[in-house]
Regions:
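Hydrophobic alpha-helical transmembrane segments in multi-pass integral membrane proteins
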Residues: 75-81, 125-137, 180-195, 235-248
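Internal transmembrane alpha-helix with an interfacial aromatic "cap," most often the third helix
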Residues: 74-81, 86-134, 154-158
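Membrane-helix boundary elements
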Residues: 14-22, 62-73, 124-135, 145-164, ...
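Cytoplasm-facing juxtamembrane segments at the starts of transmembrane helices
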Residues: 2-10, 56-65, 105-125, 141-145, ...
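Short, aromatic-rich membrane-interface segments at the entry and exit
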Residues: 27-37, 83-91, 136-144, 167, ...
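Hydrophobic alpha-helical membrane segments
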Residues: 176-179, 196-211
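N-terminal topogenic module of multi-pass integral membrane proteins
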Residues: 1-105, 217-248
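Juxtamembrane membrane-interface segments at transmembrane alpha-helix termini
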Residues: 46-54, 100-109, 129-131, 152-164, ...
Length: 248
């Protein structure tokens, strides 16, 4: 398949995300229509990407699963946004992001993997913390979702690391277990779910990036310092810019 055709399909996929969500979420989300429509859309994207990767002989399951995870997390994040204007802006921002990730499906660039991991992880954590606040399901459900989601996400991000699969799975499950324990611990704090998600994201980001460089044998003291400072600055900026409060 030519790259030009793939770019056109990528644009269609990005636009369809906006159209489907907007169609069934105006003026308010109609879950019984929106969720099934999105799942059909997600299945279609997954099938197309599988076909594209196989056709170009670059099929890899963990490379393939990244975009569906991003779309699913991004879709969940839409429900957490409180106002209609913010949702509209969110959908507009989604267009170039989805097009970018879809057009580069199968790309092995390290920076692409970093960006995709960070956006997916942030959206996923905010979604899980938000849903645990608004939908009072048994706590074990959210713990299982957190463990599985983080483990699979980390495992997909480590696919290009030149080590055995067992090493990658060990790293992924270790971070998944840590994220699950952290999710359970911070849930007792009387803070807004966005604050809890930001706090968890920053800790998970630092551990993941250090683990990533450690597996590549490129971890240095300067890198550790840099990412610690970066995570701290990011936390300060997000805490200042995010409307969070102590919950009664």
């Amino acid at each position: 398949m030519s790259n030009k055709i793939h770019l056109i399909v990528s644009a269609v996929i990005a636009i369809l995300f906006l159209v489907i969500v907007q169609l069934f979420a105006t003026p308010l989300p109609v879950f019984r229509f929106l969720v099934p429509a999105f799942l059909v859309y997600l299945a279609g994207v997954a099938l197309y990407n599988r076909f594209y990767l196989l056709r170009n002989e670059i099929w890899n399951f963990w490379m393939w699963v990244r975009l569906p995870m991003f779309l699913f997390s991004w879709f969940g994040l839409f429900f957490i946004i409180p106002s209609g204007l913010a949702r509209g802006m969110f959908l507009l921002v989604s267009l170039p992001i989805i097009f970018f990730f879809e057009s580069l499906i199968g790309n092995t660039g390290q920076q692409l993997g970093f960006n995709e991991f960070l956006l997916t992880c942030a959206a996923m954590l905010i979604t899980l913390f938000g849903f645990s606040y608004y939908f009072l399901l048994p706590g074990v459900v959210y713990l299982i979702l957190m463990f599985v989601s983080v483990s699979v996400l980390v495992r997909s991000s480590l696919e290009l690391v030149p080590l055995d699969s067992l090493v990658k799975w060990t790293a992924a499950m270790a971070l998944g277990l840590f994220a699950t324990e952290l999710f359970w611990t911070v849930s007792f704090l009387p803070l807004h779910y966005t604050a809890l998600a930001i706090f968890t994201f920053n800790i998970l980001y630092v551990l993941w990036v250090m683990y990533y460089h450690y597996l590549y044998k490129t971890l240095t003291a300067r890198q550790v310092q840099f990412h610690l400072v970066l995570a701290f600055v990011l936390a300060v900026i997000m805490f200042i810019s995010t409307p969070w409060s102590i919950q009664s």
